[in-house]
Amino acid sequence: MANRPPRIYVLAGTNGAGKSSIAGAMLRETGADYFNPDEAAHRIRSADPRMTQADANSAAWHQGRRLLERAIADRLDFAFESTLGATTIPALLASAASLRIEVRVWYVGLSSPELHIARVRARVAKGGHDIPKPDIRRRWETSRLNVIRLLPRLTELRVYDNSGDADPDTGATPAPVLLLRVRRGRIVAPRDLSATPAWAKPLVAAAMRLDAATRRRPA
């Protein structure tokens, strides 16, 4: 820790993207304190079964915000999940970057808000918690916009597509596809961006603009 800046890892994406299943384990392996709001909401509601799911979600969100604020103030490594669908968390991340804290975002997306809704519905059928459809549709737009706004401040951005469906016979889930990796303003992968799906094109376009601007800067 003494030899490098503190790091904040953000596993981001609209509800139903499959964030935890893709990279939750990898984030835990970073050694940073890791906060999963879904797990926190479950613990909160288990402790008080009279609490509604919405109230538990809200309490978990506020808990995560406080932990992020503490990590920034104390310059600690921290990892957490977020939809990045509103304004508070992106503003805190921008503040962290201005304080020379490395902010690394791994963003997981699906091809459409309707697929996010279907994945959440499948999760509910297995006992998971629900998210209102209007919230999912709104976050599908705003989360990507927030990533684009944050991009010039990020140490690293990875974008994954998790739209592939499980095999109906085996149940095997296809591996998520890495669509984009940007490090310190430069695109480092993949070499060919021509197959970028429509939902991720705004992110790739923003990364290409940043890459061009970064390369024009004097060394």
PLM-predicted stretches and their roles:
Residues 1-6, 71-72:
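Phosphate-binding P-loop
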Residues 9-10:
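Short hydrophobic/aromatic beta-strand immediately N-terminal to the Walker A/P-loop
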Residues 14:
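P-loop (Walker A) phosphate-binding loop of NTP-binding proteins
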Residues 18:
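Conserved glycine(s) of the Walker
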Residues 21-76:
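Conserved substrate/cofactor phosphate-moiety recognition/catalytic segment
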Residues 56-108, 143, 150:
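Glycine-rich phosphate-binding loop used to anchor ATP phosphates in small-molecule kinases
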Residues 99-147:
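A glycine- and Lys/Arg-enriched "phosphate-lid" helix/loop adjacent to the NTP-binding pocket
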Residues 150-219:
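NTP-dependent small-molecule kinase module
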